Amino acid sequence: MAVVARNTRTCFARRIREVVYGLGKTRCYHIPMKTPASKLPHVGTTIFTAMSALAQEVGAVNLGQGFPDFECDPRLIDLMNEAMRAGHNQYPPMAGILPLREMIAEKVATLYMHCYEPAGEITITAGATQAIQTALTAIVHPGDEVIIFEPVYDSYEPVIRMNGGVPVFATLKFPDYRPDWQQVRSLISPRTRAIMINTPHNPTATCWPLEDMHALEALLRDTDIFLISDEVYEHMVFDGALHQSVARFPALAERAFIISSFGKTYHVTGWKIAYCLAPKALTTEFRKAHQFIVFTVHTPSQYAIANYMALGTHNDLQQFYQARRDFFLSHVEDSRLKWCPSHGTYFVSAQYAHLADFAGMPDVDFAQHLARKYGVACIPVSAFYHDATDHKTVRFCFAKREATLAEAASRLMKV
């Protein structure tokens, strides 16, 4: 804190009267403010920011942070411009414009055979991370426990802690990353308030099958435990598989906040627009928090997306990203890295423990080595564990142009 000027208008430090040579004189001393106790003392710069900065520093192809390097559909941009020119530039309703919520309800009913009421059960949010924070704020009280599955997207734990909750870590068993339901059951306590799931899963690119959804149903039956389901990659499920949305399962949907992302679906991550589905009673609590966290969301984006949804392009996303996945893997399948299956999302992971020259290297160091020496940035999967569990695995994003993927692949072939 800067030294405070010594006059009555600008001196905000304490005034201390001293007696100097028997005369009373007032001097203004700067007394440093105590550093506040951090609510997140162990949280620093995210690995995504760090690796993207490193990629820029060394000129590496950035397959680390999950965003496309190609443009969205020009029709969506045109619809955004039309919305702004039509005067949709002031506050929309707190829950989002009704036409967009109606389009979401129609999509969900078509895909998952579950009817959400647009007025009272669908809320537009400023990205999926805000939706996650709002859902947790709505239901978590100090001391409540929230079970999350590791490896886990890095925002879950901090947001639980910011709300006074206690994260409880279940493990997706390496290398298949399937839940151990016996372990999950053992973690449930009288303080368990919610369970958070993510399918398709970031970072492992796995998708929960019907078997696991039924196991989750059985686990939660006859409990008052809430469910937060992060389904932002719902349209990126490959090889003919179906996305097992919580909305398909009435016994789960009745206790669930389901979150999805237009940014992911329409290649506009910078627009930060998503939505939350929940039964009316849960939505009421969600909106109580939502109105004071963000109040509402960018108006022209909502009108643009509402009109764009009618085109049905989300139905093409599975084929679009499966082609990207197959293109990339076809160019790296003969590399020394061992590539893990990618069943969904726009990520794929690779293992290197079998490589004698790298086996002793922590995955954080290996990721930095790939960026500095070979010119490809990725994300170490240990960053998705609270205790930095290291399975010698790194994650790559293939939401890129074919030219970008081909260049990255040619560099990885030299590892």
Question: Residue spans of the language-model regions?
Answer:
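PLP-dependent enzyme catalytic core of the Aspartate aminotransferase-like
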Residues: 25-32, 106, 185-186, 359-360, ...
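N-terminal small-domain helix-loop-helix segment of the aminotransferase-like
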Residues: 34-127, 134, 308-311
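Conserved PLP-anchoring active-site segment centered on the Schiff-base-forming lysine
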Residues: 138-160
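A short helix-loop-beta submotif of the ANL/AMP-binding
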Residues: 162-168
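A short helix->loop->beta-strand "cap" motif at the edges of active sites that frequently abuts
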Residues: 165, 222-225, 253-254
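Active-site phosphate-binding strand-loop segment of PLP-dependent enzymes
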Residues: 172-239
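PLP-dependent aminotransferase class I/II
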Residues: 255-344
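Conserved PLP-binding catalytic core of the aspartate aminotransferase-like
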Residues: 321-322, 335-373
